[in-house]
Design a protein with these regions (language model features):
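Binuclear metal-dependent hydrolase catalytic cores
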Residues: 1-116, 121-124, 137, 194-212
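Cap/insert and terminal regions of metallo-dependent hydrolase folds
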Residues: 121-210
Length: 212
């Protein structure tokens, strides 16, 4: 970051290690002139700050949370709406072990939705045909851009139902259901090659009418 930026907002979807392992190396934490606002969900039995303190402690990380130099503000969210520098941000719990939230960020009529870890078919008895009770639909509907979990192929997903991740096929169906304009698939299985990812997408869109 530009050293002249003295206030930063971090939006956490959840606290699995693959999503927070870089926090300890974030330079603004060590600048006493900086204010860092952290937004994220509390755990079922621990507050957000208690969960962050567990990460910022040995053996996970040598610097303890109380030793960080910046002024740190903790904001616990659930199904919430809040504002940051003109952005209206809506958070909503998603189907993923956690607890986990996704985000809908709105500014000037444009909408970006962010759901890196999400299993949309788990929360609905009639997915992908019915939006009611579909996890994440409320914060993705008609988004200009949706970032969405694309972890598995269909065969992989069949063996991992309930793990909190989406197949590429379900992610595309979710994008269609939500009527998004553009979609970015990510949070891929690290064992997949680029060629495999392309093949998964090609197979997932065969025979489907894609509206984005």
């Amino acid at each position: 970051l530009d050293p002249g930026i003295l206030e930063v907002n971090i939006l956490l979807t959840h606290l699995h290690i693959d999503h927070i392992m870089g926090l300890g190396y974030f330079k603004p934490f060590y600048n006493p002139e900086c204010t860092v606002n952290i937004w994220g969900p509390a755990g079922s039995s621990e507050s957000l700050i208690e969960r962050l303190r567990r990460y910022f402690s040995p053996p996970f990380f040598p610097v303890r949370f109380r030793e960080l130099s910046a002024k740190i503000n903790i904001h616990e969210i659930d199904n919430s709406t809040f504002n940051i520098d003109g952005f209206t941000i809506k958070s909503e719990y998603l189907c993923h072990p956690g607890p986990t939230v996704g985000y809908r960020c709105e500014l000037g009529g444009s909408v970006v939705s962010f759901m890196p870890d999400h299993e949309p078919s788990l929360g609905s008895s009639d997915f992908p045909h019915l939006s009611e009770w579909c996890s994440g639909y409320n914060i993705s509907e008609k988004a200009d851009l949706l970032f969405h979990d694309g972890q598995y192929s269909n065969s992989e997903y069949d063996r991992r139902v309930g793990w909190g991740h989406s197949s590429v096929s379900d992610a595309i169906d979710f994008g269609n259901l939500s009527k998004v304009k553009k979609m970015v698939l990510f949070h891929h299985d690290p064992a997949h090659t680029d060629m495999q990812l392309e093949e998964m997408v090609d197979k997932s869109i065969q025979g489907k009418k894609i509206d984005f």
